[in-house]
Amino acid sequence: MKKSVIGSLLALSLVLLFAGSAFAVDINLSVAASLREVVTELSDTFAKSHAGVTFQNNFGASGVLAKQIESGAPADIFFSANLEWMDYLKERKLLDEKSISTFAHNVLVFVGKPESKVTRLEDVIKLEKIAIGSPKSVPAGEYAMQAFNKAGIDKQLENKLVMARDVRECLLYADRGEVDGAFVYKTDAEEMAKNVKILFIVQQDLYPRVTYPMALTPEGSKKAEAIAFLKFLQSAEAKSVLAKHGFVVN
């Protein structure tokens, strides 16, 4: 009798285990580094109301993430910090084109020590070391280079630039005093800066508007939960969270 009861309980446990596994779904997100906090908050909110859904978040430079996806890294939704890397994957048929949409917008700023006399773009040529994200893979760095070129100061800055792997590392260099200032996004400066402050906002006519597109990958388009999460990201609730973190949502 005792063995029978134990056997029944064991069988029931296995049934419950496999039933739970059947409803468990991982959603893999590849996310531009500057979206770390807001996407983490939004994915946590979604998971709380969708039993069995868990998120695997991969944060980094948009170009690095795109190359990872191209190489077969698991990803259901890609969030880029510019249109270029979204187009890169679209051209390679690695995105569900119909799902491409705008997640948010941002602004490029320059941060430095509070006592700094730098108040405009032309002033940065007086500095010795300036951090930007590597333009080859970091959109913030590419935006900065475009601003330098348009302002006609690119030649004066070329030997002063310190390249960072992503925009967060760029901010960290400035915060630790390893550079005299850094070009980062406004949201990063407002949320993460400890020892530096925003010295000026880069004129919008000097670089393309910072746009964060998002899209499902072919794998993600097969997951109902990933599709539902993408829809949630376009909701009024999600936009309220984006605005709270300093992003522009229109």
Regions found by a protein language model. Give the residues of each.
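Positively charged n-region of N-terminal signal peptides that target proteins for export
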Residues: 1-7
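Bacterial N-terminal signal peptides
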Residues: 8-19
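Exported/periplasmic ABC-transporter solute-binding proteins
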Residues: 23-49, 54, 58-59, 63, ...
